[in-house]
């Protein structure tokens, strides 16, 4: 506490001097640059330590999964913003990131929260199938969509899910959260009477939980990864522009019925 009774400000992330930068206890120049991957650096920032080899493989896998998904609303928003403000690449990326909502890329935290809260205090031998059934029943009773299920494009199967779970299994990180997510998918499918396949955000929410990440930061995984993809969209916009064409066509087609013939 300070003399005025206020809590002293404190950060454990990094510090620097005129000739040194230290991040989470590691000298940036000597220990990290040229020695760790971008994914490992992100893990270090979030967890306060470098990952083990299995953790590195799994964390990098979920980050790679979230970098790119084509011409999504966030990518279009980034391109259009760059058209209007080419002096502000960071503004265009930010515009795209603001589009990472519950439909595209964002709800990793919803899935992680559902899983972490469902298993909070549960004993090691807990009946996961019973927990899954209870989660689905509660979500449906509240009129909510079950997090981590369904996709507007990948109707029958999200091809990223089996590969993510395979990587997790190969690295010893396919545990209760992954098993519960799969059981929730099965229970939701039975309750709905139609297929509700797991999507990538559900898989990533489960794997992030296996890695011990709190659900509150799990949407940040999508933010970090998709920023890379959005920079690539802006680079492509410089090489193969489409934003101006999108603007022109929307302007013409949306008001076509109002124009005199």
Sequence positions of predicted segments:
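Non-transmembrane, aqueous-exposed alpha-helical and coiled segments at domain scale
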Residues: 1-261
């Amino acid at each position: 506490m300070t003399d005025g009774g206020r809590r002293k400000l404190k950060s454990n992330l990094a510090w620097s001097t005129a000739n040194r930068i230290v991040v989470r206890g590691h000298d940036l120049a000597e220990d990290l640059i040229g020695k760790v991957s971008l994914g490992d650096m992100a893990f270090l920032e979030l967890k306060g330590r470098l990952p083990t080899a299995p953790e590195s493989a799994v964390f990098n896998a979920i980050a790679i999964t979230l970098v790119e998904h084509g011409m999504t609303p966030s990518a279009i928003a980034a391109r259009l913003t760059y058209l209007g403000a080419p002096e502000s690449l960071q503004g265009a990326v930010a515009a795209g990131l603001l589009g990472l909502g519950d439909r595209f890329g964002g709800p990793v935290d919803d899935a992680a929260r559902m899983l972490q809260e469902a298993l909070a205090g549960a004993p090691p031998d807990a009946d996961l199938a019973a927990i899954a059934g209870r989660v689905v029943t509660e979500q449906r009773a509240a009129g909510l969509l079950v997090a981590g299920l369904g996709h507007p494009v990948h109707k029958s199967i999200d091809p990223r899910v089996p590969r993510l779970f395979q990587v997790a299994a190969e690295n010893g990180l396919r545990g209760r959260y992954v098993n519960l997510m799969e059981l929730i998918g099965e229970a939701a499918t039975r309750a709905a009477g139609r297929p509700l396949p797991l999507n990538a955000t559900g898989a990533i929410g489960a794997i992030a939980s296996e890695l011990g990440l709190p659900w509150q930061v799990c949407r940040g995984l999508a933010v970090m990864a998709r920023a890379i993809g959005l920079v690539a969209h802006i680079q492509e916009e410089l090489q193969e522009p489409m934003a101006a064409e999108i603007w022109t066509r929307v302007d013409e087609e949306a008001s076509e019925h109002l124009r005199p013939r």
